Design a protein with these regions (language model features):
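Short amphipathic C-terminal alpha-helix that caps PH/PH-like domains
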Residues: 113-125
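Short, structured beta-strand-loop surface elements
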Residues: 59-116
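Extreme N-terminal tail/first-helix region
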Residues: 1-19
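A generic structural signal for nonpolar/aromatic side chains embedded in well-ordered alpha-helices
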Residues: 18, 65-66, 120
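Conserved small/polar residues in nucleotide/adenosyl-binding loops
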Residues: 144-146
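Basic, polyanion-binding surface patches
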Residues: 133-139
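Short beta-strand segments
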Residues: 21-58
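Short, structured loop/turn "capping" segments at alpha-beta junctions
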Residues: 126-131
Length: 146
């Protein structure tokens, strides 16, 4: 990051940004072409180690791209605020963001899918759902771990 004084490195500050975001942009690269898709997510954070969970269909472009190249980029942003000025060039925009890289893998084990779906639902709704409240057909769809 060019402006080091603005870099967020403290785990609690990173967690605050993640908590405020409900959408993450997931970026892939294939044969020189970039593909970015917004997705809902859940997460787990232990110390400085962040794991993202994304639910998706069992087939499609995301799954195909992960199978070809598991390297991904992520971006999420929140706390948007326009800073007004008297002149056009005095305007600015404030926001908090998280940008990173990782390796995506497709989760195969049903029990891991259920755990990850629980993380997604907890992050998106603020509620903890019992396993019995999960649709078995949805559990069998793909889940991505980053």
């Amino acid at each position: 990051m060019r402006r080091r004084e603005r870099e967020v490195v403290e785990p609690n500050e990173i967690r605050d940004i993640i908590e405020a975001c409900k959408v993450c942009r997931l970026g892939f690269c294939e044969e020189g072409e970039v593909y970015i898709v917004p997705v809902n997510f859940g997460y787990d954070m232990k110390g400085k180690e962040l794991t993202l969970y994304i639910h998706c269909a069992g087939e499609g472009r995301k799954i195909d791209l992960i199978r070809k190249n598991a390297k991904v980029g992520i971006e999420m942003d929140c706390h948007h605020e326009l800073a007004e000025g008297d002149l056009a060039c005095q305007y600015s925009y404030y926001y908090a963001s998280l940008i990173g890289n990782g390796h995506a893998k497709i989760v195969e084990e049903t029990y891991k899918k259920k755990e990850a779906l629980g993380k997604i639902m907890e992050h998106q709704t603020g509620k903890i759902f019992d396993e019995s409240e999960m649709n078995p057909k949805l559990v069998e769809l793909s889940l991505i771990h980053i």
